[in-house]
Design a protein with these regions (language model features):
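Short glycine-rich anion-binding loops that position phosphate/pyrophosphate groups of nucleotides
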Residues: 16-19, 91-93, 243
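Protein kinase-like catalytic core scaffold
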Residues: 86, 141-142, 171-172, 223, ...
Length: 300
């Protein structure tokens, strides 16, 4: 259970649940009645919903890859034929879960998630699932052009960068990559799918400004903004991720030999919280003094 505290002014929320099934924002408001979430709950919900995030970015003029939101399978097939490769994404999720690279093999639309490739079959409803050797997938369909270049040796994925944004600054950058690309699903560059991290010491001013515009567009004071660029195009925003009760930003880059305090994302976030305390006049938090036992209604 969560202890009642009325002396807490700010909360930094990470994934958690209420065993009773009540919406977490309601639970936290009942336990911490004076507290504000450093990342507002509406921002957490927005960034958890990839289609809603995409619409917000487009509305604010933030550059993104060509994107299709549709219920029509014919639209998906036409989109893939036009771009050769595309990524089909679950509307909600993280760590690359539900991502499939799409392409045509002869006349068959194929989908590869990095572990296996399946013929894609569109169905009317139900969750995505493997039936036999086929992937059954129901609408809505959220599809993005796979950004890269065609070389003599084949398709080459663009450079995927992550901007770690804290209060309108980008203290450091990372890149996700693979040493080898053996199958279309390897173009899903997520650490949970076997990709690697490395730090990037400098980026263009345009890339930095694009990342900051994306964070501002969704209202995020702290965010990890994923972008892709090639020698001919970009930067384009892929996603905006925030720490939330739905998910948290990956910190496994702390295991890199090159890691230094400067790359400590949590340290930058803590400094932002302290600055907020100083500018708003919030008092330093102390442990709550013991209260006399009172009968309180139980929350369910």
């Amino acid at each position: 259970s969560y202890q009642f505290r009325d002396d807490i002014e700010w909360l930094y929320v990470l994934p958690c649940i209420d065993p009773s099934g009540r919406p977490l924002p309601d639970l936290l408001h009942s336990r911490f009645p004076r507290a504000h979430s450093f990342i507002p709950f509406e921002v957490q919900d927005l960034c958890w919903d990839k289609t809603a995030t995409q619409k917000r970015l487009l509305d604010r003029g933030v550059p993104t890859p060509e994107t299709l939101l549709t219920h029509d399978p014919d639209d998906v097939e036409h989109f893939v034929r036009r771009h050769t490769y595309a990524i089909l994404k679950e509307p909600r999720g993280c760590a690359g879960t539900g991502h499939w690279v799409l392409w045509f093999e002869d006349s068959t639309l194929m989908a590869d998630n990095g572990w296996a490739a399946h013929p894609l079959r569109f169905v009317g409803d139900g969750p995505s699932r493997i039936v036999g050797d086929e992937l059954y997938y129901a609408p809505p369909y959220y599809v993005q052009r796979l950004v890269g270049t065609f070389q003599r040796t084949g398709f080459e994925i663009g450079q995927v960068l992550r901007a770690y944004v804290v209060e309108s600054e980008v203290p450091f950058w990372g890149e996700r990559y693979r040493e080898h690309y053996r199958r279309p699903g390897d173009w899903i560059l997520n650490v949970a799918r076997g990709a690697r991290y490395r730090f990037v010491l400098s980026v263009s001013e345009e890339t930095k400004n694009t990342a900051l515009r994306a964070a501002r567009a969704v209202g995020a004071r702290v965010a990890a903004v994923d972008l892709v660029r090639t020698s001919a195009s970009g930067p384009l925003v892929l996603e905006v991720n925030v720490d939330s009760y739905h998910m948290c930003i990956d910190r496994s880059f702390k295991d890199l030999p090159e890691f230094r305090d400067y790359y400590d994302f949590d340290r930058h976030v803590a400094h932002a919280l302290l600055r907020t305390e100083e500018t708003t006049g919030v008092r330093t938090l102390r442990p709550a003094r013991p209260r006399q036992r009172q009968r309180r209604p139980r929350h369910s």
